[in-house]
Amino acid sequence: MSKRKSCVSILLTLVLVLSTFTFFGVRSEAATVTVTSVAELQQAINNSSGETEIVLANDMQLTATVTIPAGKSITLQGGVTLTRTSSAIAFDIKEGGSLTWQDIKLDGNAKDTNYKSAVINNQGKLTINGGEIKNVRSNSPMVGIVTTKGPNAVLTMNGGSIHDNYMSNQFNNVVKITEGASFFMNGGDISNNTLEHSGSSGLNSAVGVEGIRGSSTMEMTGGTITGNTAEYGGILVGTYSTNYTMQNNFSNPAHYYSTGTLNLKGGTISNNTAAVLGGGIAVNGTGKLTMDGGTISGNKAPFGGGIGVVDYLTSADGKRFGETRWRGFFPASVTINDGLITGNEATMTAVTSQITDPNAENGVGGGMYVASKEVYINGGQFTNNTAGKQGGGIYVASVPYKLQMGKTLVTGNTATKIGGGMWLCPTGSATTAVTNGASFFDNKAGNGAENNDTGSAGDDVASINKQDPASQTLILSNNGLDNWLVHWYEDGKIDEAYLGNSDGSPRYPNTVSPVVDRGTLDGITEKIALKAIVSDEGKAAARNVAKVIVTGNTAPRGGGIGSNGAVAFGTDPVNYDKVDLTVSKMWENSNTSHVTSVTVGLFRITKANFDAVALTNADGSALDTTGMSESEIFQAKVDKLMASGANTYAQIDQVALSNANDWKFKFVDLLKYDMVNDAQDTTNPNIYFAREMDTDGNWAANDANATFGAQQIRASYKATKNASGAYDQVIKNEEVKKTEIEVTKKWVGDRESKVEVQLYKNGNPLGASRVLEGANNWTTKFDNLEVRDAGATEDNVYSVREVGEENGAIKIGAKHYKVSYSAIDQDGKMTITNTKNPTPKKDKPPTPNTGDGFGRGMTALFGMSALGLLVLVYNKRRRYQ
């Protein structure tokens, strides 16, 4: 085949393929159609094939319902306004149909809606990316201005605004998600809508996610729901009433357990007002809420300014069905893992006749109201919420409801009457678990204990006499977050009023004398007001590990948390075996200028880890502990442990010792055993030890010197096992005794220009040598010398020697000196005397001869003769050889 024929074949094939695509309607992009009337719009929709963009060329009067049939995928744009002219549905999206709303404005023109109807009825897919839906005025019941209904119906809102609509009947919503539908809100706003709630009106909310005839869901990751007014505020999750639910769900077993679910991950729900429950979100009956993010702020309601939760278990129907069965139908469950609930208010927003709770005449639960046994707060922040009566941050309604909170910090809250951090009514209970419970501190009742405000009581906790002591108790662990101790003290007293007021007693620390650390309060049923004292280090640790923060909230009672039901912080165990120990400080009687306060830290380690600390010599060999006392071995292990940088021990408290507490502190109700998986390990007891902090912020080791103020102090520790099995600790501080030696050089007979002297300690040189010379008057002073080393049993021996001196003598240049040392006197002075040795005498010259010289002459003559004879003999011998 020629190349030309081959190319022609390829082109023909390509044309055939493209023709086939066109024949079957395959398109590379959506078709665009422009229309100028509602009739043209509907015709364009009906004629569309595949994705179609319809541009509205001008504003239009909606004289008929626009229908999106199954199989149609339409995008509307053009930025124009569509105005309703009747109460009919404006847009009807059938199951299988899809409408994307780009930038169209839908003006409701104050027109009504029909019974059980909508303005936009969506049983398919509706995506709102922009535009507006506004100015609808509905007086009919069971209406959703934007209704998404059915298991295959989906509403997605990425932008746009649904705002300023009005509704005045029951079971209504601006946005209704029902019968198994789904709503994804990623952006845009639903704002400033009004739903009447007086007279026969009510049972409505701006957004409704209904658990009716199927489980509906909403996921919110962005956008804003704000400024709406209704009986249930911003979002209702669940159902409006138990009767309404049973009528709709119990006729079909498939719908028995229908729920409405909100997954809140982002966005803002703000400044909404509810007449009854949940200014921001109402989780009612069949509702479920999971909050992993987002902000709920500035909302108002009598029950739960931010969030209100009700399961109706205490209703007549709830009692008739029984708890287990009822909770299957009406879980009203909430799980909060993260997010911010702030600035909400529990206050009266409706007539009192609509409020059935006698304790709510001024609003309860500024941040959250709990009337359910399925509420878990694992994380998140409740800040700056207020309640007119009880529970500024959170309020638990009654028995049998229970709120479960994990790793909670309650701080900086205020009650004008009692219980700045938490208040429990006569039926209220609270428990804090040992290892993952809660820390309370720096809350305030009235003007606080620090100002002795006797008109209030209980800066941190107040609890009223219990109606049923067998089941209603207060259990507060003194083991706070990150295992730092919380010291509980009585802080004023409470009168006999049902909800409790201060009886005018003095505040902490003058409520009881002497002050008593209550330790862990286990099963308290009588009225009590409490102040929590936590070290600054313990506060920092709590802030670091807390997952739930309750702070800045206010109410007359229970600024942070109020409860008529139960609050459980953390998981088991609540009860545990305990030990006590006392740390005492001793000063020398002679030391009257020591510091007035000393910081002591308490540390904890398990016995298994403590036993693993090996004592060694400097060369690494095992230390022979024979003859060492139990306390000496104990302290040696502690010192090695702390010097090693190991992480097997942890500080759990820090207190000040001073004259005010007689230089001692008793630590009570400490954990006897290690906790493993929230249970006691009775095979592994805890060991506690104390160390004091010096002025430089260092922990002073045993038998070591440390600075305390202007003094050098030697700290020593003694541990003695007490009856509980812990070790009482005595810290003895002795001022380090110092001495000095002043050395003066004395010369006898002669002197040099300078000499050097060396200080010795116990026979070994100490420091550099010193020069003695005329410039320093031949005197120097060695000062700050320790009389006895830390840990030693004998005093040091100091001496000074002249450098170069040996055996009492020294040669300097050509001169010889004798060196003598005086003893060190009681004033620490000594003298080194150098005495010049006399110059050695020269050998005596021969005595001159005064005789006649005869003897010397004869001697010379004899010598000369002998020499001559020897020469003669020598020569003769050579000749004959």
Where are these regions (language model features)?
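Sec-dependent signal peptide cleavage junction
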Residues: T20-V33, P848-F854
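N-terminal capping/linker segments that flank leucine-rich repeat
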Residues: K3, V26-S48
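Bacterial N-terminal signal peptides that target proteins for export
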Residues: M1-L11
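Solvent-exposed loop/turn and edge beta-strand elements of beta-rich ligand-binding domains
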Residues: L16, I225-G227, T259, I269, ...
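Surface-exposed loop/turn motifs in large extracellular/passenger domains
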Residues: I68-T75, F91-A110, A118-R137, M142-M167, ...
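Bacterial N-terminal signal peptides
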Residues: L11-F23
